[in-house]
Amino acid sequence: MPRGSVLLLASLLLAAALSATLGLGSPVKEKRGWTLNSAGYLLGPHALDSHRSFQDKHGLAGKRELEPEDEARPGSFDRPLAENNVVRTIIEFLTFLHLKDAGALERLPSLPTAESAEDAERS
């Protein structure tokens, strides 16, 4: 048994010596100071975009401070999406057609009528 423990001890010492000389051990990560990413994470995008310093920022720094925007919430009907704009455009067009059929647009002087467009084509 003593021969086995000596062999085990010798193999462990050899492995430690080889890993230290060949650089196979765990490399120590160097800390090189602030980077743009770390500053952006700690200060948030509003601080980097306006180039404010640490002293100008009031309150705690970090992304935890930022509130989620109401527009990004799923199920919100007030958000300006292309779908909402299309629906609004269709509703406005249908309202325009309804007013045109009712004759309400004939009293407005700023809109050209269909008769005046025909008169312009004839002359």
Swiss-Prot record:
Residues 20-30 form a propeptide. The modification Alanine amide is found at residue 61. The keyword Cytoplasm does not apply. The modification Phosphoserine is found at residue 116. Residues 1-19 form the signal peptide. Keywords: Amidation, Cleavage on pair of basic residues, Hormone, Neuropeptide, Phosphoprotein, Secreted, Signal. GO terms for biological process: neuropeptide signaling pathway; positive regulation of transcription by RNA polymerase II. One of its GO terms (molecular function) is neuropeptide hormone activity. Residues 53-79 are annotated as: Disordered. Its main location: secreted. It comes from the Eukaryota. The keyword Metal-binding does not apply. It is found in: Secreted. One of its GO terms (cellular component) is extracellular space. Pfam families: Galanin, GMAP. PANTHER family: GALANIN, GALANIN PEPTIDES. Endocrine hormone of the central and peripheral nervous systems that binds and activates the G protein-coupled receptors GALR1, GALR2, and GALR3. This small neuropeptide may regulate diverse physiologic functions including contraction of smooth muscle of the gastrointestinal and genitourinary tract, growth hormone and insulin release and adrenal secretion. This is Galanin peptides. It comes from Bos taurus. The lineage of its organism: Eukaryota, Metazoa, Chordata, Craniata, Vertebrata.
